[in-house]
Amino acid sequence: MFQVVKRDGELDEFKMGKITAAIDKAFDAKGKNYSSDMIDLLGLRVTADFQNKIENNRISVEDIQDSVENVLIQAGYSDVAKAYILYR
């Protein structure tokens, strides 16, 4: 797997659960109904979206967050994307 470069420069192992948890919280913030399968699918789409941004087996947390926003908007959840932006 690859590593995530955090804002403070520290490295952390990539964990899909962090992406899906953040998406889950954004849906909750908007009071939207969702299934865990849908959240998992959105998480997979996020990882596909940022694949080309991985360099030397590393990606920045900002690039991941940008991909979450892009995927939510593309999936028709612009209101959830706004909640995610506020959450991050």
Across the structure, where does each feature detected by a protein language model lie?
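Long, C-terminal-biased catalytic regions of enzyme "large/alpha" subunits
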Residues: 1-88
